[in-house]
């Protein structure tokens, strides 16, 4: 019989594929895991299964035609990405959206934040075995998607933001319905917390799992909830306010342990803060200062209204030129970042003075978070991989692009 040392030398780690057809793999993620028994020794994320060449496609389209591609990046909260691209193009053009358009944009970006956090919190609970939260969460997401549809005609890929404003104004009834929804939604968040926050099993699966220190968060290029969970109050809406966020009164929740449980708690609290911002937006839209146009009054950038086109030949020509050739953007380069639900979503836009972007580099927050899977998962059990993955909040549309 061989001695123990020879046996130990003959042992080798077990390698398995986690995904891409795995229910906890969130889309098309493929992880190659190296296991020593149940303990994870190495994680190798394989990306690219949802690569569609978005950045190259944007170079072939006019600035207006590029907007729908941003809906298809983080398709859980589409309008937040459109926001970054529109702000970047507006910066190059030297224009600013009217006040009402800014309020509508911020309102819908916060709806997107709640859409994303609801999906994440409830599916994270499902990944560790709780089956009730997703049913409650998806009921609320359905109502929010109806608000998307009533504004833009589409439940997911809205293409509602425009360079210089938004596509059309919101009907008063829709604003009232969003207001009423905000009042009732807080109760849903409380119910979710009753189920999860002090739940013994949920805490056992999340507390002290996937710990990220603040130094590690900065080193790996984390942003959003991943940084706030580690104790830094870094939120672009507060630290580098854009549009009308500077006027909004809200708090930035932070964690102290940097584990999965802290990140869950932050997302729950951020949903409450988003409702606060939405209520403020609605109040400001009802004031006289919040009335008016929802796009810039420049027919070289934003198409004229249908009524004008029926009366004015010049308006018809503007409309035709905008939708066939598009408008020209002055040469230059700009980087604009917004606080998307997943973290800092940035757009680096380079213009060469033509009607199409020369280069549009997308900085997806999930990409930086996914590359850290290896160092976060090492030493944890196989069952913890899905809990950690859930708390990173990764969507593959933006990772693979």
Swiss-Prot record:
Entry EC no(s): 7.1.1.-
Subcellular location as annotated: Cell inner membrane
Keyword hit for Transmembrane: no
Signal sequence annotation: none
Entries under SUPFAM superfamilies matching the protein: HydB/Nqo4-like (SSF56762)
Similarity comment: Belongs to the complex I 49 kDa subunit family.
PANTHER family noted in UniProt: NADH DEHYDROGENASE [UBIQUINONE] IRON-SULFUR PROTEIN 2, MITOCHONDRIAL (PTHR11993:SF10), NADH-UBIQUINONE OXIDOREDUCTASE 49 KDA SUBUNIT (PTHR11993)
Protein name: NADH-quinone oxidoreductase subunit D
Organism of origin: Rhodopseudomonas palustris (strain HaA2)
């Amino acid at each position: 019989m061989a001695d123990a040392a020879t046996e130990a030398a003959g042992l080798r780690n077990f390698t398995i594929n986690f995904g891409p057809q795995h229910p906890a793999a969130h889309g098309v993620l493929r992880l190659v895991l190296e296991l020593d028994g149940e303990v994870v020794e190495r994680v190798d994320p394989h990306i690219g299964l949802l690569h569609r060449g978005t950045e190259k496609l944007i170079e072939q389209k006019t600035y207006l035609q590029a907007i729908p591609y941003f809906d298809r990046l983080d398709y859980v909260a589409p309008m937040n990405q459109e926001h970054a691209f529109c702000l970047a193009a507006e910066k190059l053009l030297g224009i600013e959206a009217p006040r009402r358009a800014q309020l509508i944009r911020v309102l819908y970006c916060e709806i997107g934040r709640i859409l994303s956090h609801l999906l994440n919190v409830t599916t994270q609970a499902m990944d560790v075995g709780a089956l009730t939260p997703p049913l409650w969460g998806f009921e609320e997401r359905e109502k929010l998607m109806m608000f998307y549809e009533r504004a833009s005609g589409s439940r997911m890929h809205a293409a509602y933001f425009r360079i210089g404003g938004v596509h059309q104004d919101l009907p008063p009834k829709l604003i009232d319905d969003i207001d009423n929804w905000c009042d009732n939604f807080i109760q849903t968040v409380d119910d979710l917390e009753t189920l999860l926050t002090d739940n013994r099993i949920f805490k056992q699966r999340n507390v002290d799992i996937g710990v990220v220190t603040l130094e590690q968060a900065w080193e790996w290029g984390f942003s959003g909830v991943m940084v706030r969970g580690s104790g830094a109050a870094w939120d672009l809406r507060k630290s580098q306010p854009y549009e009308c966020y500077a006027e909004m009164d809200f708090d930035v929740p932070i964690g102290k342990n940097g584990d999965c449980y802290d990140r869950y708690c932050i997302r729950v609290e951020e949903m409450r803060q988003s409702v606060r911002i939405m209520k403020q937006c609605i109040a400001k839209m009802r004031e006289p200062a919040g009335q008016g146009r929802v796009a810039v009054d420049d027919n070289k950038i934003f198409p004229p209204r249908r009524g004008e086109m029926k009366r004015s030949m010049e308006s018809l020509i503007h409309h035709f030129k905008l939708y066939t050739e598009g408008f020209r953007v002055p040469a230059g380069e700009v980087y604009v970042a917004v606080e998307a639900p997943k973290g800092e979503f940035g757009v680096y836009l380079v213009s060469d003075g033509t009607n199409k972007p020369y280069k549009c580099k997308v900085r997806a927050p999930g990409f930086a978070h996914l590359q850290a899977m290896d160092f976060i998962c090492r030493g944890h059990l196989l069952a913890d991989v899905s809990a950690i993955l859930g708390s990173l909040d990764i969507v593959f549309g933006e990772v693979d692009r």
